[in-house]
Amino acid sequence: MKHTLILLLAFGLFAMTANAQCRSFTKKNCLSSLDGYIQNDNYNSAILIPGDEAELMLTFLAGQDYRLIVCSHPVLGEVSYEINDASGKRLFDSRKNEPDVNHVDFKVETTQQLQIHVQVPDSKSAIMHEGCVTVLVGSKS
């Protein structure tokens, strides 16, 4: 029982440290991309490895201009992302639109939920690097 408690405490501290590292990475490397947009209160970040995928549902309000940013640590390579509506219809694909741009600006006509799907490319390296991937949303009225 004592060993289990120590192990759980160690995992908890590791998770807190990883989250703090992602927050620091986001502040230093991602927030400036919002330029002119007001960041929403959500902080959406994860530590991913090559081959990982993550999905996130976000609500966007009618009549507002938005900037969605997918910012990732360079060690992960060219992270791609898609934006889909609630029915699964693809609205944006970073691989087809502008692969070197980490953000997309848009306006929604009706309040709706959109699904953000992020994919880290596979790596042929024997060493698995992990890195932070952050999805930021900013808005203008």
Language-model features: locations:
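Sec/Tat signal peptide C-region and signal peptidase I cleavage site
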Residues: 14-20
